[in-house]
């Protein structure tokens, strides 16, 4: 996304005019300006500079009497599901933006882009081309808290080329402000980004590094020359987040490439930092710092630290990991610090990232398998998988994620609270609670649920009961994190599925509805969800006239079974209310068949 389209140009504009404009604005460019009638194209060194050009020039600079517009250049066949929305009010709540985007279709992914501007920028992926077209049409120029939104297409590498007949059938768009529409720029010329691009493999996990701020200039080089050379040498895309955490001693770098490309770029960056340190007489050690989502760190460390110790021994390095207490809901990454020579650190990076990629692929495989079973829940928003803001590819890259506006309850309605008893290995209680209760408190805040661990039933009890109280989405978040934590901390083997038993209480009069005639309903539940569902016979109802339903299975199976049982209970309650109303009105009740 480093290629720019410059529109609304006067007929008199020449390449030297545009070169002068970019130089005055201190925006580097590569190659020549390709000027057409009323518009032009140019390449920037990287995506960061392209965004800088858009923020600095678009709608703000006049050239030969016309205010120019600058945006990402998108080949026609890649104008599909992906949009970039700029000029978003800086303090806007995510829920407000999500609900606005959902008005025009199903949103599969929404990620914030780091820019120099005060306003926010997001990249949005809709479920299909028509939803994206509606979003572009309705949101471009939309007034939100006195800010006018600016919406453009960005390349969708997963888009399938249209047949000539489809292209003829599709009407060309007219931009609301009257300039050349997106459908009127003609075909992408040779060399357009993505002209021969293939979809990225889903398993591509970027490498995230932290580097001392004083070395960022050396890594970029004069007018971006050094970073440009690194990207060419290693066939990678490198984002240096210079504006993140203003004044911080370290800045994050995200490297997108194959595992080999990421490792090669990492090694070159370490060499540049070492040379710059020598030139500036910087005497402190410069360790390699890798950022990794907390979801993967437990598996990287391994039981009793075995995995990490092996990497240290094999690579002759010293590796430490930042404490859990440093995590927040907004920063779910931990810092893996590797000390050693450049050669040994490079080897350690390969081994660390290999483990992280394996963990990521296992999680995505589980999500691919079961995501379609739970409609109406926003899987991307639940935090069970790494958010794309931390540099991880969003799960929606390979999943038809059921993210819809149904993820939010109707305005004015509060979803009913539920209580679930989840049974975990007794040995895992310490991991769930965390040091001084930090983990369970953070989990409770994250999920929006009450989470308590019941006392052990006896000194030899192998299981402990976790009592989770909250609405459906809070249950999903809390239980999902508990399943994930047990896997991370190796309470289950690397190829073993985490299966837990959950108990939910139902009114005794509704137990028959859960079982169904001759066990039909409970059998259908088991076939649909892959969970084992048991309503023990001859139970004595408790003081609240409730009996227990036992559900055993992996996370998604258990969740689907819980939701289906809650649907049955809601149906029973509605029928009861209807019967009460009918009885009060004195009308005869219809007989149940």
Swiss-Prot record:
Any one Gene Ontology molecular-function term assigned to this protein's record: mRNA 3'-UTR binding
List the GO biological process terms: CRD-mediated mRNA stabilization; mRNA transport; nervous system development; regulation of translation
Cysteines engaged in disulfide bonds, as pairs: none
Residues annotated as domain RRM: 2-75, 81-156
Judging by the UniProt lineage, the source's domain of life is: Eukaryota
UniProt keyword list: Cytoplasm, Developmental protein, DNA-binding, Endoplasmic reticulum, mRNA transport, Nucleus, Repeat, RNA-binding, Transcription, Transcription regulation, Translation regulation, Transport
Q: What SUPFAM superfamilies is this protein classified in?
A: Eukaryotic type KH-domain (KH-domain type I), RNA-binding domain, RBD
Which Gene Ontology terms of cellular component type are present? Answer: cytoplasm; cytosol; endoplasmic reticulum; nucleus
Location comes to: Nucleus; Cytoplasm; Endoplasmic reticulum
Q: Which family does it belong to?
A: Belongs to the RRM IMP/VICKZ family.
Q: What does this protein do?
A: RNA-binding protein that acts as a regulator of mRNA transport and localization. Binds to the RNA sequence motif 5'-UUCAC-3'. Preferentially binds to N6-methyladenosine (m6A)-containing mRNAs and increases their stability. Mediates the specific association of Vg1 RNA to microtubules. May regulate mRNA translation. Binds specifically to the vegetal localization elements (VLE or VgLE) in the 3'-UTR of Vg1 and VegT mRNAs. Binds to the Vg1 and VegT mRNAs in both the nucleus and the cytoplasm. May regulate mRNA translation. Acts as a transcription regulator.
Oligomeric state and interaction partners are given as: Homodimer and multimer. Associates with microtubules. Interaction with a translocation machinery protein TRAPA of the endoplasmic reticulum. Component of a mRNP complex, at least composed of DAZAP1, IGF2BP3, STAU and VgRBP60. The mRNP complex with DAZAP1, IGF2BP3, STAU and VgRBP60 is only found in the cytoplasm. Interacts with a hnRNP 1 related RNA transport protein VgRBP60 both in the nucleus (in an RNA-independent manner) and the cytoplasm (in an RNA-dependent manner). Found in a B3 activator complex.
The entry's protein name is Insulin-like growth factor 2 mRNA-binding protein 3-B
In which organism is this protein found? Xenopus laevis (African clawed frog)
- Lineage of the source organism? Eukaryota, Metazoa, Chordata, Craniata, Vertebrata
């Amino acid at each position: 996304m480093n290629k720019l389209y410059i529109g609304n140009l006067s007929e008199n504009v020449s390449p030297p005019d545009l070169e002068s404009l970019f130089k005055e604005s201190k925006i580097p460019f590569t190659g020549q300006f390709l000027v057409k009638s009323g518009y032009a194209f140019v390449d920037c060194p990287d995506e960061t500079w392209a965004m800088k050009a858009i923020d600095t020039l678009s709608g703000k600079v006049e050239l030969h009497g016309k205010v120019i517009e600058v945006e990402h250049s998108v080949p026609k066949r890649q104008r599909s599901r992906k949009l970039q929305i700029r000029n978003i009010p800086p303090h806007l709540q995510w829920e407000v933006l999500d609900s606005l985007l959902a008005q025009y279709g199903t949103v599969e992914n929404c990620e914030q882009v780091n820019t120099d501007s005060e306003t926010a920028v997001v990249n949005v992926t809709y479920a299909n081309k028509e939803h994206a077209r509606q979003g572009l049409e309705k949101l471009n120029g939309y007034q939100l808290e006195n800010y006018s939104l600016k919406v453009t297409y960005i390349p969708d590498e997963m888009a399938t080329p249209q047949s000539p007949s489809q292209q003829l059938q599709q009407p060309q768009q007219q931009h609301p402000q009257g300039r050349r529409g997106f459908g009127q720029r003609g075909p992408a010329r040779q060399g357009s980004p993505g002209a021969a691009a293939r979809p990225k493999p889903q398993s591509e996990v970027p490498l995230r590094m932290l580097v001392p701020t004083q070395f960022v200039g050396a890594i970029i080089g004069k007018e971006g020359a050094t970073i440009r050379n690194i990207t060419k040498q290693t066939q990678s895309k490198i984002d240096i987040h210079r504006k993140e955490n203003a004044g911080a001693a370290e800045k994050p770098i995200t490297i997108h490439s194959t595992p080999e490309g990421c490792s090669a770029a990492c090694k070159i960056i370490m060499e540049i930092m070492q040379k710059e340190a020598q030139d500036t007489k910087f005497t402190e050690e410069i360790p390699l710092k890798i950022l990794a989502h907390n979801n993967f760190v437990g598996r990287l460390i391994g039981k009793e630290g075995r995995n990490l110790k092996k990497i240290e021994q094999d690579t002759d390095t010293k590796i430490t990991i930042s404490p859990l207490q440093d995590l927040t809901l907004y920063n779910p990454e931990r810092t893996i610090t590797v000390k050693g020579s450049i050669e040994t650190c490079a080897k350690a990076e390969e081994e660390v990232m290999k483990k992280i990629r394996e963990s990521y692929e296992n999680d995505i495989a589980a999500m691919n398998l079961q995501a379609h079973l739970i409609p109406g829940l926003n899987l991307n928003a639940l935090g069970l998988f790494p958010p794309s803001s931390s540099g991880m590819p969003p799960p929606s890259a390979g999943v038809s994620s059921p993210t819809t506006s149904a993820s939010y309850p109707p305005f004015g309605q509060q979803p009913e609270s539920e209580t679930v008893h989840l049974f975990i290995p007794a040995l895992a209680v310490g991991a769930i609670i965390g040091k001084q209760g930090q983990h369970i408190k953070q989990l409770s805040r994250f999920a929006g649920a009450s989470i308590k661990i019941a006392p052990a039933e006896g000194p030899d009890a192998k299981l402990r009961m976790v009592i989770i109280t909250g609405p459906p989405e809070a249950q999903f978040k809390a239980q999902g994190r508990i399943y994930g934590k047990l896997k991370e901390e190796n309470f289950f083997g690397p190829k073993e599925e985490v299966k837990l038993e959950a108990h939910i209480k139902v009114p005794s009069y509704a137990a028959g509805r859960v079982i169904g005639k001759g066990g039909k309903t409970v059998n259908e539940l088991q076939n649909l969800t892959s969970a084992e569902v048991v309503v023990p016979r001859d139970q004595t109802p408790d003081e609240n006239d409730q009996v227990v339903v036992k559900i055993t299975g992996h996370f998604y199976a258990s969740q689907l079974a819980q939701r289906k049982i809650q649907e049955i209970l809601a149906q029973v309650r509605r029928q009861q209310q209807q019967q009460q109303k009918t009885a009060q009105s004195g009308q005869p009740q219809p007989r149940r068949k």
